[in-house]
Curated annotation (Swiss-Prot):
Main location: mitochondrion
Gene transcribed to yield this protein: pgam-5
Entry protein name: Serine/threonine-protein phosphatase Pgam5, mitochondrial
EC number: 3.1.3.16
Source organism superkingdom: Eukaryota
Gene Ontology biological process terms, A to Z: positive regulation of mitochondrial fission; protein dephosphorylation
Listed transmembrane segments: 8-24
Catalytic activity, reaction form: O-phospho-L-seryl-[protein] + H2O = L-seryl-[protein] + phosphate; O-phospho-L-threonyl-[protein] + H2O = L-threonyl-[protein] + phosphate
Keywords assigned: Hydrolase, Membrane, Mitochondrion, Mitochondrion outer membrane, Transmembrane, Transmembrane helix
Length: 284
Protein backbone atom coordinates (compact mmCIF):
# COMPACT_ATOMS: atom_id res chain seq x y z
CA UNK A 1 0.00 0.00 0.00
CA UNK A 2 2.79 2.46 0.94
CA UNK A 3 4.65 1.87 -2.33
CA UNK A 4 1.44 2.51 -4.31
CA UNK A 5 0.85 5.74 -2.38
CA UNK A 6 4.38 6.93 -3.11
CA UNK A 7 3.86 6.28 -6.83
CA UNK A 8 0.72 8.41 -6.82
CA UNK A 9 2.64 11.46 -5.63
CA UNK A 10 3.34 13.56 -2.54
CA UNK A 11 -0.16 15.09 -2.08
CA UNK A 12 -1.74 11.64 -1.86
CA UNK A 13 1.00 10.34 0.43
CA UNK A 14 0.47 13.33 2.73
CA UNK A 15 -3.24 12.62 2.78
CA UNK A 16 -2.61 8.98 3.71
CA UNK A 17 -0.51 9.99 6.72
CA UNK A 18 -3.14 12.47 7.84
CA UNK A 19 -5.92 9.92 7.67
CA UNK A 20 -4.10 7.65 10.11
CA UNK A 21 -5.48 9.92 12.84
CA UNK A 22 -9.09 9.38 11.74
CA UNK A 23 -11.57 6.53 12.22
CA UNK A 24 -11.95 3.83 9.53
CA UNK A 25 -14.98 5.40 7.82
CA UNK A 26 -13.50 8.87 8.03
CA UNK A 27 -10.21 7.59 6.64
CA UNK A 28 -11.86 6.10 3.58
CA UNK A 29 -14.04 9.12 2.95
CA UNK A 30 -11.22 11.66 3.33
CA UNK A 31 -8.78 9.60 1.31
CA UNK A 32 -11.05 9.09 -1.67
CA UNK A 33 -12.28 12.70 -1.69
CA UNK A 34 -8.74 14.03 -1.93
CA UNK A 35 -7.58 11.21 -4.21
CA UNK A 36 -10.45 12.04 -6.55
CA UNK A 37 -9.52 15.72 -6.60
CA UNK A 38 -5.86 14.84 -7.18
CA UNK A 39 -6.78 12.48 -10.00
CA UNK A 40 -8.88 15.13 -11.74
CA UNK A 41 -5.91 17.51 -11.76
CA UNK A 42 -3.06 15.06 -12.34
CA UNK A 43 -4.75 11.74 -13.05
CA UNK A 44 -3.98 10.96 -16.68
CA UNK A 45 -0.39 12.12 -16.48
CA UNK A 46 0.31 10.29 -13.23
CA UNK A 47 -1.45 7.12 -14.33
CA UNK A 48 0.26 7.03 -17.73
CA UNK A 49 3.69 7.47 -16.16
CA UNK A 50 3.30 4.28 -14.15
CA UNK A 51 0.96 2.33 -16.42
CA UNK A 52 1.85 3.19 -20.04
CA UNK A 53 -0.91 2.45 -22.51
CA UNK A 54 -1.03 2.14 -26.27
CA UNK A 55 -3.51 3.77 -28.59
CA UNK A 56 -6.28 1.72 -30.19
CA UNK A 57 -5.60 1.24 -33.90
CA UNK A 58 -8.94 2.19 -35.48
CA UNK A 59 -7.93 0.81 -38.86
CA UNK A 60 -6.52 -2.46 -37.53
CA UNK A 61 -8.12 -4.50 -40.34
CA UNK A 62 -7.38 -1.96 -43.11
CA UNK A 63 -11.12 -1.78 -43.77
CA UNK A 64 -11.77 1.75 -42.67
CA UNK A 65 -14.07 3.11 -45.43
CA UNK A 66 -11.46 5.43 -46.92
CA UNK A 67 -9.02 2.51 -47.17
CA UNK A 68 -11.48 0.70 -49.45
CA UNK A 69 -12.11 3.58 -51.85
CA UNK A 70 -10.58 3.30 -55.31
CA UNK A 71 -7.71 5.81 -55.45
CA UNK A 72 -8.43 6.76 -59.05
CA UNK A 73 -12.06 7.58 -58.30
CA UNK A 74 -11.02 9.45 -55.14
CA UNK A 75 -8.62 11.73 -57.00
CA UNK A 76 -11.23 12.62 -59.62
CA UNK A 77 -14.12 13.21 -57.20
CA UNK A 78 -15.21 16.56 -55.76
CA UNK A 79 -16.06 16.95 -52.06
CA UNK A 80 -19.59 15.61 -52.45
CA UNK A 81 -18.33 12.76 -54.56
CA UNK A 82 -15.75 11.83 -51.92
CA UNK A 83 -18.41 11.74 -49.23
CA UNK A 84 -20.49 9.41 -51.39
CA UNK A 85 -17.52 7.13 -52.06
CA UNK A 86 -16.84 6.83 -48.32
CA UNK A 87 -20.51 6.23 -47.53
CA UNK A 88 -20.63 3.37 -50.03
CA UNK A 89 -17.75 1.64 -48.26
CA UNK A 90 -19.15 1.84 -44.73
CA UNK A 91 -20.03 -1.41 -43.02
CA UNK A 92 -23.49 -1.64 -41.45
CA UNK A 93 -23.57 -5.21 -40.09
CA UNK A 94 -22.00 -6.71 -36.97
CA UNK A 95 -19.98 -9.91 -37.10
CA UNK A 96 -20.22 -12.34 -34.19
CA UNK A 97 -17.42 -14.90 -34.12
CA UNK A 98 -17.78 -17.96 -31.88
CA UNK A 99 -14.46 -19.70 -31.27
CA UNK A 100 -14.95 -23.29 -30.12
CA UNK A 101 -12.18 -25.44 -28.74
CA UNK A 102 -12.40 -29.15 -29.61
CA UNK A 103 -13.40 -31.78 -27.06
CA UNK A 104 -11.09 -33.86 -24.89
CA UNK A 105 -8.86 -36.14 -26.98
CA UNK A 106 -6.38 -39.00 -26.62
CA UNK A 107 -3.04 -37.28 -25.99
CA UNK A 108 -1.03 -40.46 -26.49
CA UNK A 109 -2.79 -41.60 -29.67
CA UNK A 110 -1.14 -41.04 -33.04
CA UNK A 111 -4.35 -39.65 -34.58
CA UNK A 112 -5.40 -37.80 -31.40
CA UNK A 113 -9.10 -38.56 -31.79
CA UNK A 114 -11.78 -37.59 -29.26
CA UNK A 115 -12.27 -39.58 -26.08
CA UNK A 116 -15.78 -40.70 -25.09
CA UNK A 117 -15.85 -37.68 -22.76
CA UNK A 118 -14.78 -35.42 -25.62
CA UNK A 119 -17.67 -36.64 -27.76
CA UNK A 120 -20.08 -36.09 -24.90
CA UNK A 121 -18.75 -32.55 -24.43
CA UNK A 122 -19.38 -31.84 -28.12
CA UNK A 123 -22.93 -33.20 -27.85
CA UNK A 124 -23.66 -30.91 -24.91
CA UNK A 125 -22.26 -27.89 -26.74
CA UNK A 126 -24.27 -28.76 -29.84
CA UNK A 127 -27.45 -28.84 -27.76
CA UNK A 128 -26.59 -25.50 -26.20
CA UNK A 129 -26.06 -23.88 -29.59
CA UNK A 130 -29.28 -25.41 -30.93
CA UNK A 131 -31.25 -23.99 -27.99
CA UNK A 132 -29.65 -20.53 -28.19
CA UNK A 133 -32.17 -19.15 -30.73
CA UNK A 134 -29.21 -17.84 -32.73
CA UNK A 135 -29.34 -18.38 -36.48
CA UNK A 136 -25.75 -19.31 -37.19
CA UNK A 137 -24.42 -18.25 -40.57
CA UNK A 138 -21.62 -20.73 -41.22
CA UNK A 139 -19.05 -23.02 -39.63
CA UNK A 140 -15.33 -23.30 -40.33
CA UNK A 141 -13.44 -26.21 -38.81
CA UNK A 142 -9.79 -27.11 -38.46
CA UNK A 143 -8.72 -30.09 -40.57
CA UNK A 144 -7.20 -31.86 -37.55
CA UNK A 145 -9.16 -34.96 -36.50
CA UNK A 146 -10.17 -33.81 -33.00
CA UNK A 147 -11.57 -30.53 -34.35
CA UNK A 148 -13.37 -32.18 -37.28
CA UNK A 149 -14.94 -34.77 -34.97
CA UNK A 150 -16.09 -32.02 -32.61
CA UNK A 151 -17.55 -29.98 -35.46
CA UNK A 152 -19.44 -32.92 -36.96
CA UNK A 153 -21.01 -33.80 -33.61
CA UNK A 154 -22.11 -30.17 -33.14
CA UNK A 155 -23.50 -30.04 -36.68
CA UNK A 156 -25.95 -32.86 -35.87
CA UNK A 157 -27.80 -30.35 -33.69
CA UNK A 158 -27.81 -27.49 -36.22
CA UNK A 159 -29.71 -26.96 -39.49
CA UNK A 160 -28.63 -29.20 -42.38
CA UNK A 161 -28.21 -26.23 -44.71
CA UNK A 162 -25.61 -24.49 -42.51
CA UNK A 163 -22.61 -23.60 -44.69
CA UNK A 164 -19.51 -25.49 -43.56
CA UNK A 165 -15.88 -25.41 -44.66
CA UNK A 166 -12.55 -26.86 -43.50
CA UNK A 167 -9.31 -24.91 -43.17
CA UNK A 168 -5.74 -26.07 -42.48
CA UNK A 169 -4.85 -22.51 -41.48
CA UNK A 170 -6.54 -22.89 -38.09
CA UNK A 171 -4.80 -26.14 -37.15
CA UNK A 172 -3.00 -26.21 -33.80
CA UNK A 173 0.52 -24.84 -33.50
CA UNK A 174 2.75 -22.36 -31.63
CA UNK A 175 1.42 -18.91 -32.60
CA UNK A 176 4.00 -16.69 -30.90
CA UNK A 177 6.87 -17.09 -28.39
CA UNK A 178 5.09 -16.78 -25.03
CA UNK A 179 6.16 -14.60 -22.13
CA UNK A 180 6.86 -15.99 -19.60
CA UNK A 181 8.33 -19.12 -21.15
CA UNK A 182 6.68 -22.46 -20.53
CA UNK A 183 8.81 -24.79 -18.38
CA UNK A 184 8.43 -27.88 -20.56
CA UNK A 185 6.92 -26.72 -23.87
CA UNK A 186 9.62 -25.05 -25.97
CA UNK A 187 9.18 -25.24 -29.75
CA UNK A 188 12.25 -24.42 -31.81
CA UNK A 189 12.51 -20.99 -33.41
CA UNK A 190 12.01 -22.35 -36.96
CA UNK A 191 8.67 -23.83 -35.86
CA UNK A 192 7.54 -20.51 -34.40
CA UNK A 193 8.69 -18.79 -37.58
CA UNK A 194 6.56 -20.92 -39.90
CA UNK A 195 3.57 -21.72 -37.69
CA UNK A 196 3.17 -18.16 -36.43
CA UNK A 197 2.90 -16.94 -40.02
CA UNK A 198 0.16 -19.49 -40.74
CA UNK A 199 -1.87 -18.64 -37.64
CA UNK A 200 -1.46 -14.90 -38.19
CA UNK A 201 -2.66 -15.42 -41.76
CA UNK A 202 -5.75 -17.16 -40.40
CA UNK A 203 -6.37 -14.28 -38.02
CA UNK A 204 -6.22 -11.72 -40.83
CA UNK A 205 -8.57 -13.76 -42.98
CA UNK A 206 -11.15 -14.30 -40.24
CA UNK A 207 -11.02 -11.11 -38.18
CA UNK A 208 -12.22 -7.95 -39.89
CA UNK A 209 -15.32 -5.79 -39.91
CA UNK A 210 -18.20 -6.81 -42.17
CA UNK A 211 -18.10 -6.09 -45.89
CA UNK A 212 -20.25 -3.13 -47.02
CA UNK A 213 -22.30 -5.66 -49.01
CA UNK A 214 -23.23 -7.59 -45.84
CA UNK A 215 -26.64 -6.31 -44.79
CA UNK A 216 -27.45 -8.56 -41.82
CA UNK A 217 -25.48 -9.44 -38.70
CA UNK A 218 -23.61 -12.73 -38.96
CA UNK A 219 -23.01 -15.46 -36.37
CA UNK A 220 -20.01 -17.54 -37.37
CA UNK A 221 -18.71 -20.73 -35.75
CA UNK A 222 -14.99 -21.53 -35.78
CA UNK A 223 -14.01 -24.96 -34.39
CA UNK A 224 -10.28 -25.10 -33.74
CA UNK A 225 -7.66 -25.23 -30.97
CA UNK A 226 -6.63 -23.60 -27.71
CA UNK A 227 -3.39 -21.99 -28.89
CA UNK A 228 -5.07 -20.55 -31.96
CA UNK A 229 -8.04 -19.19 -30.01
CA UNK A 230 -5.89 -17.61 -27.31
CA UNK A 231 -3.73 -15.91 -29.91
CA UNK A 232 -6.85 -14.68 -31.75
CA UNK A 233 -8.15 -13.15 -28.50
CA UNK A 234 -4.92 -11.22 -27.93
CA UNK A 235 -4.76 -9.98 -31.52
CA UNK A 236 -8.44 -9.02 -31.71
CA UNK A 237 -8.20 -6.94 -28.52
CA UNK A 238 -4.80 -5.51 -29.54
CA UNK A 239 -3.21 -7.03 -26.46
CA UNK A 240 0.47 -8.09 -26.53
CA UNK A 241 0.46 -11.41 -28.44
CA UNK A 242 3.13 -12.89 -26.19
CA UNK A 243 0.49 -13.11 -23.43
CA UNK A 244 -1.60 -15.78 -25.13
CA UNK A 245 -0.35 -18.63 -22.91
CA UNK A 246 -1.52 -16.87 -19.74
CA UNK A 247 -5.09 -17.96 -20.52
CA UNK A 248 -6.54 -21.44 -20.13
CA UNK A 249 -9.47 -22.78 -22.17
CA UNK A 250 -11.51 -25.87 -21.36
CA UNK A 251 -12.44 -28.50 -23.90
CA UNK A 252 -15.53 -27.56 -25.92
CA UNK A 253 -15.43 -24.06 -24.45
CA UNK A 254 -17.04 -21.13 -26.22
CA UNK A 255 -15.40 -17.74 -26.82
CA UNK A 256 -17.60 -15.02 -28.36
CA UNK A 257 -16.03 -12.00 -30.06
CA UNK A 258 -18.02 -9.20 -31.67
CA UNK A 259 -16.75 -6.90 -34.45
CA UNK A 260 -18.95 -3.86 -34.99
CA UNK A 261 -19.31 -1.82 -38.20
CA UNK A 262 -16.82 0.86 -37.12
CA UNK A 263 -14.23 -1.75 -36.23
CA UNK A 264 -14.82 -1.77 -32.49
CA UNK A 265 -14.08 -5.19 -31.00
CA UNK A 266 -15.51 -6.61 -27.79
CA UNK A 267 -15.41 -10.00 -26.08
CA UNK A 268 -18.69 -11.31 -24.70
CA UNK A 269 -17.21 -14.46 -23.23
CA UNK A 270 -13.90 -16.33 -23.01
CA UNK A 271 -13.74 -20.08 -22.45
CA UNK A 272 -17.42 -20.38 -21.49
CA UNK A 273 -18.18 -23.96 -20.37
CA UNK A 274 -21.54 -23.28 -18.75
CA UNK A 275 -23.09 -26.09 -20.80
CA UNK A 276 -20.87 -28.70 -19.10
CA UNK A 277 -21.65 -30.16 -15.66
CA UNK A 278 -18.68 -30.20 -13.25
CA UNK A 279 -17.89 -33.87 -13.89
CA UNK A 280 -17.65 -33.25 -17.65
CA UNK A 281 -15.09 -30.43 -17.54
CA UNK A 282 -11.54 -31.02 -18.78
CA UNK A 283 -8.59 -28.94 -19.98
CA UNK A 284 -6.53 -31.41 -22.03
Amino acid sequence: MVSKIIKLGVPTATLAVGTLLLGDDEKRSAFFRTASAFTQNHGHKTFDEHFPRGEWDKNWDFRDPISLVDKGKWEKADEEGKKKLIEEKKATATRNIFLIRHGQYHLDHEVKMLTPLGREQAELLGKRLANSDIKFTNMTMSTMVRATETANIILKHLPDDLTRTSSPFIEEGPPYPPVPDHKTWRPLDPEFYTEAARIESAYRKIFHRASPSQKEDSFELIVCHANVIRYFICRALQFPPEGWLRMSLGNCSLTWITIRPKGHVSVRSIGDIGHLPPNKISFT
